[in-house]
């Protein structure tokens, strides 16, 4: 599973859901799908896919200012 994060600060692409905090992190099944999404938005310079390893999830949680345990995930497309 892959998330897409901003290269500048590691903050992930999230889906805003009313009443849910933190916002769910959007995920893609493959790196190719994540890269295709980035390219479709013309955001290759700003975004990058990351495999959701334990280390990556720790970094994403830190960027979001929350505990890893409180993170939720939403597959793309939802």
Regions found by a protein language model. Name each.
Residues 1-78:
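Conserved NAD+-utilizing ADP-ribose enzyme module
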């Amino acid at each position: 599973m892959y998330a897409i994060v901003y290269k500048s600060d590691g903050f992930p692409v999230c889906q805003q859901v009313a009443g849910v905090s933190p916002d769910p992190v959007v995920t893609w099944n493959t790196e190719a799908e994540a890269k295709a999404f980035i390219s479709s938005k013309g955001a290759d310079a700003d975004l990058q896919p990351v495999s959701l390893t334990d280390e990556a999830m720790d970094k994403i949680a830190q960027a979001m200012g929350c505990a890893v345990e409180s993170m939720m995930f939403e597959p793309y497309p939802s």
